């Protein structure tokens, strides 16, 4: 993947997460009709530099994305699972929020304050995004 710039990349990541959040109820209705359990998920988004590429030996190469940014996004996804309400929870970092010009009017955001993320010395500002659309 090639970056389109930090602001565009952050906006596209958040737009994708919001699209998932807004459409998962339709998917869950279809799953219910088939007798399948509903899906729930958590999404963490942090913006910054990552290292991408094929890693490993010539016998076994795997495409990977690594770095502090990836670690932070993963930690946001797994943060305080007891606070997960609804079908999809989206947590973004303050770094990501600062890159996004505007959110759609039907998107509420709630600050969780700053959180010390495992593996980092600096705490992250954490914001939850939630659709208020019916």
Q: What residue ranges belong to the model's regions?
A:
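Cytosolic regulatory/linker segments at or just downstream of nucleotide-handling modules
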Residues: 50, 81-134
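Catalytic/regulatory signature loops of cyclic-dinucleotide turnover enzymes
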Residues: 46-47, 55, 68-94
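Histidine- and acidic-residue-rich, metal-dependent catalytic cores
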Residues: 20, 44, 94, 98
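Sterically constrained small-residue positions within well-ordered secondary structures
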Residues: 34-36, 54, 117-120
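Active-site loop/short helix in cyclic nucleotide turnover domains
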Residues: 1-4, 49-57
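Alpha-helical scaffold within the catalytic cores of cyclic-nucleotide enzymes
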Residues: 3-43, 68-81
